[in-house]
């Protein structure tokens, strides 16, 4: 089941973009929005506000990638770091396992894997050119054991 909705920030001045048009496409995205909105170390954040062009190898055309999040973080050493964050279920961060029979579902998964790899390659280049970091966060980072929020992967970049 997919959970989508509109997010209303409690700190709209921190939001880079129009704070009245923030939408989440999963509860993980919403959880990360709350984290960005309420965390004092997050100085600025945006959701799908950056556009990164990427070449999709399957059709040879340039497409537009809207990463889930942009954040500007004040690290514990008081240095500022900018990051682009993609929130994905862990199963989509690994190549699909080939079944005994090639199904339509498997073919679709292979296509999506290829598309994601192209997007993430261009996102890494985009970030490298701008002295930023690119991170992919999964449910293991956002909801370990489904008990509480743990952003240890993100905190590693805050120090």
Per-region residue spans from a language model:
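Conserved small/polar residues in nucleotide/adenosyl-binding loops
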Residues: 152-159
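Interdomain/boundary linker segments immediately adjacent to catalytic/signaling cores
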Residues: 1-26, 154
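Catalytic cores of nucleic-acid endonucleases
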Residues: 87-147
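Short, solvent-exposed polar/charged micro-motifs at secondary-structure junctions
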Residues: 54-59, 144-150
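Acidic active-site catalytic centers that drive phospho-/nucleotidyl reactions
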Residues: 68, 86, 158
């Amino acid at each position: 089941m997919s959970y989508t909705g509109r997010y209303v920030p409690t700190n709209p001045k921190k939001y880079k973009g129009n704070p009245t048009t923030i939408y989440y496409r999963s509860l993980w995205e919403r959880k990360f929005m709350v984290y960005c909105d309420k965390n004092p170390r997050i100085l600025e954040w945006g959701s799908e506000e950056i556009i990164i062009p990427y070449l999709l190898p399957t059709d040879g055309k340039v497409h537009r990638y809207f990463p889930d999040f942009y954040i500007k973080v004040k690290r514990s050493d008081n240095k500022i770091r900018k990051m682009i964050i993609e929130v994905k279920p862990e199963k989509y961060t690994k190549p699909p396992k080939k079944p005994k029979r090639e199904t339509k579902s498997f073919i679709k998964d292979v296509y999506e894997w290829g598309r994601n790899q192209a997007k993430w390659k261009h996102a890494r280049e985009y970030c490298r050119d701008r002295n930023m970091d690119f991170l992919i966060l999964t449910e293991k980072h956002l909801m370990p054991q489904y008990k509480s929020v743990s952003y240890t992967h993100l905190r590693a970049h805050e120090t």
